[in-house]
């Protein structure tokens, strides 16, 4: 059991018969009344996001999850195949279970598979990934002084806002939690 006062981003807990990852939390101490913790949680089985409020000091069960390092191999219809590089064991995950993460996956990319009681429930991406720009408008001289941005389509189909100096074929570092441009690679 863990106190809600000890919440950290990325912590995995068991609440309401589900396995949830803490995405965000805020300790609130109102002038009147008891303190509470407002949290934003993602269900690791369904991908649903829920906001939940806990009373200060309330205890919740910490989920015992295992992470296995695997490589993304390929898409097979609506399933995606991953392989353990040590045992060469392959597993398939349905597209709807990892829909958010698919925007960042490239073939042969190393990721962590999240396991709970022997069941595969999702994947953990690195904080940043390197992706190549496949389509964007050309930058026009003088545009950089305004500090604006333009949309760019990346090799996985993800569209992000990038600075005007980015061109097709550039390799970019992308933040996976915010789906945002970080820098050139």
Curated annotation (Swiss-Prot):
Main location: cytoplasm
Aminoacyl-tRNA synthetase recorded as keyword: no
Family recorded in the similarity comment: Belongs to the elongation factor P family.
UniProt-listed NCBIfam families: efp, PRK00529.1
Biological source species: Listeria welshimeri serovar 6b (strain ATCC 35897 / DSM 20650 / CCUG 15529 / CIP 8149 / NCTC 11857 / SLCC 5334 / V8)
Keywords assigned by UniProt, alphabetized: Cytoplasm, Elongation factor, Protein biosynthesis
Pathway info: Protein biosynthesis; polypeptide chain elongation
Protein's cellular compartments: Cytoplasm
GO cellular component: cytoplasm
HAMAP family the UniProt entry points to: EF_P
Identification of the protein by name: Elongation factor P
Pfam families tied to this protein: EFP (PF01132), EFP_N (PF08207), Elong-fact-P_C (PF09285)
Disulfide links within the chain: none
Chain's role: Involved in peptide bond synthesis. Stimulates efficient translation and peptide-bond synthesis on native or reconstituted 70S ribosomes in vitro. Probably functions indirectly by altering the affinity of the ribosome for aminoacyl-tRNA, thus increasing their reactivity as acceptors for peptidyl transferase.
BP terms from Gene Ontology: peptide biosynthetic process
Any one GO molecular-function label of the UniProt entry: translation elongation factor activity
């Amino acid at each position: 059991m863990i106190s809600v006062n000890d919440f950290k981003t990325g912590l995995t807990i068991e609440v309401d018969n589900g396995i949830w990852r803490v995405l965000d939390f805020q300790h609130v101490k109102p002038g009147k009344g008891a303190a509470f913790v407002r949290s934003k949680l993602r269900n690791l089985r369904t991908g649903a996001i829920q906001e939940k409020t806990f009373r200060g000091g309330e205890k919740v069960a910490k989920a015992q999850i295992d992470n296995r390092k695997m490589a993304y191999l390929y898409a097979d219809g609506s399933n995606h195949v991953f392989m353990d590089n040590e045992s060469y064991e392959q597993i398939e995950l349905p597209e709807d279970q990892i829909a958010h993460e698919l925007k960042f996956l490239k073939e042969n990319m190393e990721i962590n598979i999240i396991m709970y009681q022997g069941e595969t429930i999702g994947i953990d991406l690195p904080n940043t990934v390197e992706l190549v720009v496949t389509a964007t408008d050309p930058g026009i001289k003088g545009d950089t002084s305004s500090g604006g941005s333009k949309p760019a389509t990346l090799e996985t189909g993800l569209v992000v806002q990038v600075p005007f100096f980015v061109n097709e074929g550039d390799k970019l570092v992308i933040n996976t939690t915010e789906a945002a441009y970080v820098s050139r690679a």
